[in-house]
Amino acid sequence: MRGLAYNPDILPAELIIRHKIKPMPTREELLQRNSFPSINENKYLNAILRKDKCNR
């Protein structure tokens, strides 16, 4: 705090910026969004398996 802006009556907890937290969507909403694709659509896993296959 700088200069004349200091106020000893203000508690540190009152200075914390409050963030709005969005609630977690329901399971049905997540499935509808395709948030959890099939394991066959996992490009990272496919790349690792392809790399491992080439090394054999």
UniProtKB/Swiss-Prot annotation:
Organism the protein comes from: Salmonella phage P22
Listed Pfam families: DUF2737
Top-level taxon in the UniProt lineage: Viruses
This protein's name: Uncharacterized 6.6 kDa protein in eae-abc2 intergenic region
